Amino acid sequence: MNELFTDASTLSYDGILFEGVTAIIAKLNSTPKTVHKILTFDAQSTSNNDILCFVTGDLIFDGKASDPWIFAETFILRNGGTAGYFFYNDILRIN
């Protein structure tokens, strides 16, 4: 997963900011395992060839599909990095 982020990457996870590969990976590894059920996905290119994405859906914790949490995520994919594109900015909000 490290190749999806660079030291320029930022993640806002429910209002808390994490900057750089190390901090972002540590946060993601500390969260409970979930299944993401994507309900909507929109994307468009930006003026500098980044990709702006918006996703909404359900998070299912511990296999409890009857009690999903709703999430919204907006992120920018930037050309570069070892994977070709990387998460430049990512905002995740869980409702």
Task: Indicate residue ranges for each PLM-predicted region.
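A solvent-exposed, acidic/Ser-Thr-rich amphipathic alpha-helical stretch
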Residues: 2-49
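Short secondary-structure boundary micro-motifs
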Residues: 1, 59-61
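A short hydrophobic beta-strand element
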Residues: 47-59
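Short beta-strand edge/turn micro-motifs at domain boundaries
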Residues: 54, 64-95
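A short linear-motif detector with a strong N-terminal bias
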Residues: 16-19, 31-34, 53-56, 65-66, ...
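Eukaryotic basic, amphipathic alpha-helical target segments in cytosolic regions
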Residues: 9, 13, 32, 61-63, ...
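Generic alpha-helical propensity signal that fires on short helical segments
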Residues: 29, 42, 59, 73-75, ...
